[in-house]
Amino acid sequence: AQGGERVLITVGVHGNEQCGLVAVNQLAAEGFFEQLWAEDSKLSELTLMIGNPGAVKANARFVDVNLNRIFVDEAKVRSGGDSYEESLTPALAEAIDQSTWYLDLHSTSAPTPCFCIPASASSIAVSESLPVQYVLEELLCSLEGTTLHWASRDAGRVAVCVECGQHLEPESV
């Protein structure tokens, strides 16, 4: 892709958190993503990625280990590992590294208002423009091992985790 923003949206990093997958499928069915390619668009690439397909298929948080806690050691992330989730980290890390904007969609097991967590100070303005009830800026530096923490290594990247509300509640999608 030439110039423009390279956007990555991940869903299903935790397999039992499927509201993001449902929402992305609904948006695709409604033609939303085609609208992003207007002539004046600053978007050059959009990647939609299921973070943990095996866990999504099993409707389980994870298969072997929590994928959203193992993005710590760069060498291990880049080479993968023995567990199912560790085998996913090289491709997911590469996709994050290639993006200029990263949106990671999650949901919660308990009733929760929609909120987001920006990965860096440069992501706060974007977070505040999203249709969420609040932004948790206090968690900027406390999420080690997550895909959001991995994304924050590039201070210029806009990266936000959105917790959409309770799993599969209609208002969460």
Residue ranges and their predicted role:
Residues 1-173:
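Structured catalytic-domain cores with a bias toward divalent-metal coordination
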